[in-house]
Swiss-Prot record:
Pfam family, one: Mito_carr
A Gene Ontology term for the protein's cellular component: mitochondrion
Protein name in the entry: Uncharacterized mitochondrial carrier C1682.09c
Organism of derivation: Schizosaccharomyces pombe (strain 972 / ATCC 24843) (Fission yeast)
Alphabetic keyword roster: Membrane, Mitochondrion, Mitochondrion inner membrane, Repeat, Transmembrane, Transmembrane helix, Transport
Length: 300
């Protein structure tokens, strides 16, 4: 059977520009929120008072004036900018490339296995999962960003190039856990978004969604993604925020979490993450889906 051709396929330039713009807008609004979320996930033990919460969030600036507290939430901004923009370009412009490939070569298989509507949505989800696994090549930037946010002492006065030279492949520590987190997380993100467009809004061409439709379907995808990936995300974050000279394996962290903190520790930071990372992901996903068609029309 001949492959189904995609209509109104956006240019790759529009995908890159739209994704980069979404990443820049996201970073400018949500970097402090991301810092708070990472620090809460990295905290061991229970928070029992507002004073303790203040210390966990603001670290050394806990007793500082308000302005200094605010600026303390912007550590590693350079790493964050580089990582976030590259990651959004890769994720939001890369998924359509994989989706186009699957559509041209395996669309009939998806439709036959899952049905026409579900097959299309699962194809989008599968493309997202494949791209999500590939994100591990960005791990060094992610590691540097998280360490700067949660464990700045790990830098010990070294610059980024010195760290890259010293640590080499150690910066990919936890790559397996990252891939294990990204595969279902990205599947749920793009799958939830696609299913909402397919069955709630009855869209035949997902790129024709309105801003409201993109916003609503992004909420569905982002919520599913964060819940599905939460346990592995906690492990990944703890692997990455350890000192360079005192690493711990994911299985050691897993064992200690079960032994000392209990099963609920795997969902530490989930509520603030849904309230903080959730809007961030919804915002960037909505903007990418809206800006890519916009730039495609603008550049034609």
């Amino acid at each position: 059977m001949a492959p189904v051709q995609l209509k109104n396929k956006e240019s790759q330039t529009a995908r890159i520009v739209g994704s980069a713009s979404a990443g820049i807008l996201e970073l400018s609004l949500f970097h402090p929120v991301d810092t708070i979320s990472k620090r809460l996930m990295s905290n061991h033990g229970k928070i029992t008072s507002l004073t303790q919460l203040n210390t966990v969030i603001f670290r050394d600036a806990a007793s500082a004036p308000l302005l200094q507290k605010a600026t303390s939430l912007f550590p590693g901004l350079g790493y964050a900018a580089c990582y976030k923009i590259v990651q959004r370009i890769y994720k939001y412009s890369g998924q359509p490339i994989v989706k186009d490939f699957l559509n041209e070569n395996y669309r009939h298989t998806f439709d036959k296995t899952f049905g026409k509507g579900s097959g299309k949505a699962i194809m989008h989800a599968t493309a997202g999962s494949i791209v999500g696994i590939g994100e591990i090549f960005l791990l060094p930037l992610d590691v540097l960003k998280i360490k700067r946010q949660t464990n700045p002492a790990a830098f010990k006065g070294r610059g980024v190039f010195r760290i890259l030279a010293d640590e080499k492949f150690a910066l990919y520590r936890g790559w397996g856990w990252t891939a294990a987190r990204n595969a279902p997380g990205s599947f749920a993100l793009f799958g939830g978004n696609a299913f909402a467009k397919e069955y709630i809004f009855k869209l035949k061409d997902y790129s024709q969604a309105t801003f409201f439709q993109n916003f609503f379907t992004s909420i569905a995808g982002a919520s599913a993604s964060l819940i599905v990936s939460a346990p592995l995300d906690v492990i990944k974050t703890r692997i990455q925020n350890k000192n360079f000279d005192n690493p711990q394996s994911g299985f050691t962290i897993l064992k200690n979490m079960l032994k000392f903190e209990g099963p609920t520790s795997f969902f530490k930071g989930l509520t603030p993450k849904l309230l903080t990372t959730g809007p961030k992901l919804v915002f960037s996903f909505t903007m990418a889906q809206t800006l890519i068609p916009f730039f495609d029309k603008l550049l034609k």
